[in-house]
Amino acid sequence: MSANAEAQCGSISEDNTHSSTTCQGYVLPEGKIMPNTVFVGGIDIRMNEAEIRSYFEQYGTVKEVKIITDRTGVSKGYGFVSFLDNVDVQKIVESQISVHGKRLKLGPAIRKQQNLCSYMQPRPLAFNPPAPQFHSVWTNQNTETYVQPQAVVSPLTQYVQTYAYSSPAVLIQQQVPVGYQPAYNYQAPPQWVPGEQRNYVMPPVYTSVNYHYSEDPEFIQTECAVPEPTQMSGNSPQKKSVDRSIQTVVSCLFNPENRLRNTFVSQEDYFRERRAHHFRKGRAVLKSV
């Protein structure tokens, strides 16, 4: 700070403005020169404002003495002296003032200009992801779509400006992309209309079964899908009907003559034929032994 004080020994312009110039090898700061105010550097830590006032009263009526201190109250070694009347600041700067054998460093008081156009870089606005859509797995004539409510999008950070006015906030309206499909399903009970006919369609679960018979030339290695038995919910109404999805083409494996005649067999007939086949197979093994 003492070097900055020595650099303030330049001349005062008529319009009370100071540009960036050099004086004794030091660059003077840019800003506006405060009238009737002197910068005082090299202040000893033991000096107080009353003692400094007594040294500058010989140049005019002192209005205020201000010593700059840090947060703890310790002097930073420089301050300002302002006069009540118009004084020749250049004459005071060129004078030699020493306190306790130490020369004070004087100069014009310059107020730095603030950049009013400075602002912080805006942060990107954070908004919630698109709301997933849920489709009911129940088969009904009226397709139901459940959309989770979306929170209101509000900008987290706006431009921090030093202007006196405030700019209006910009709200970004979020749009849900078309064709968005969630990675999970949502099961919801259907809303039935009184008097509407209810149809329950339960998809069958198939198990792959391999059959390989080497004794009988009429049987070949075949793979077919056999549905697993499913149980209807206890709350669903009981209807006497035949589920066509349980029937499968299995009769061709045990009775080649019925390949064209009996295309579909029930699950009960399938297990009956299977037990009969294992019984015949066991008898053939005993005869060969």
Swiss-Prot record:
The record's subcellular location field reads: Cytoplasm
Give the GO biological process terms: 3'-UTR-mediated mRNA stabilization; female meiosis II; oocyte maturation; positive regulation of meiotic nuclear division; positive regulation of translational initiation; spermatogenesis
Principal subcellular localisation of the protein: cytoplasm
GO MF terms held by the record: identical protein binding; mRNA 3'-UTR binding; translation activator activity
- Coiled-coil positions are none
What CDD domains would the database entry show? RRM_DAZL (cd12672)
Q: SUPFAM superfamilies, per this entry?
A: RNA-binding domain, RBD
Domain named DAZ is located at: 162-187
Cellular component annotations (GO), alphabetically ordered: cytoplasm; nucleus; ribosome
Q: Which UniProt keywords apply?
A: Cytoplasm, Developmental protein, Differentiation, Oogenesis, RNA-binding, Spermatogenesis, Translation regulation
- RRM domain location: 36-117
Tell me where on the tree of life, at the top rank, the source sits. Eukaryota
Q: Where is this region: Disordered?
A: 1-20
Q: Name the Pfam families on file.
A: RRM_1
Q: Member of which family? A: Belongs to the RRM DAZ family.
Q: What is this protein called?
A: Deleted in azoospermia-like
Q: Which gene encodes it?
A: DAZL
